[in-house]
Amino acid sequence: FSIYAYSSEYMRYKIIYFFESKDPVIDITILIHDDILSKITGNEALFVYARRSNGMRIPLAIDIFEVDKMKKNYNVKLDNTMSMIKDQTLSSAKEIIVEARITKYKKAMTMPGDYIGRSLPMKINSSNYILIKINSVVTGE
């Protein structure tokens, strides 16, 4: 499944990806806790995004995947071409947090019942590696 589905946004993304600098690149390994994995139906979406550690919560880079109910590990790369707003990229931030969220609602907003994991705040280098464990449930606070 693709949120772009042959739209002009998808074409914009492909053109940007081909021509613009991708640095910095964040390599992410996502591990899903066994208790959460047992509740996955295969109808969920996995949102992986990086945002500033303070200030605006707008994703600086984002990717979205279908969740396989038997898959425990995901390997994801985020880079400058995956921003939602042209001047709000990974390279525009001094420090970021990376979050991985599984949702049955398939919406960008975090909802009660979503499963989530996040990194600690980190400074961005030209190459970064992060391990995220999805091991928490979002409550309706």
Question: Residue spans of the language-model regions?
Answer:
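A beta-strand/beta-hairpin structural motif
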Residues: 64-86
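Short acidic/polar inter-strand loop motif in beta-rich domains
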Residues: 85, 102-115
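Short amphipathic, basic-aromatic surface patches that mediate peripheral association
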Residues: 29-39, 82-85
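Beta-strand-rich interaction surfaces with strong enrichment in secreted/lumenal proteins
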Residues: 16-17, 60-67, 86-88, 117-123
